[in-house]
């Protein structure tokens, strides 16, 4: 089954902020990163479980895809794969309590 890959509003805002930060220094690098990220995420349409479980929080029902240096956290739902958060790879923090419940 082919699933849609969708962004929760918070994750969409996080991605747009990343692209804006990169674009402030180099617009072409921002476009290249956006394309790299979307390409990495596109595999989830056909292989939604292909991302790895989070090494820091293996009990969470969340997986990740890496588009270096960013980590895209997602959940597989019946209707779609939902990107729920975007973190810079060096970020170490407690998991947001709302990851599992972020609404589309």
Segments and roles (model prediction):
Residues 1-36:
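Arg/Lys-rich, positively charged N-terminal/basic patches that mediate binding to nucleic acids
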Residues 15-19, 60, 64-66, 80-82:
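A general secondary-structure boundary signal
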Residues 31-32, 52-56, 95:
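Short, hydrophobic secondary-structure boundary micro-motifs
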Residues 39-67:
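A short, surface-exposed loop/turn module that caps and links secondary-structure elements
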Residues 67-71, 75-104:
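Enriched for short, Lys/Arg-rich terminal
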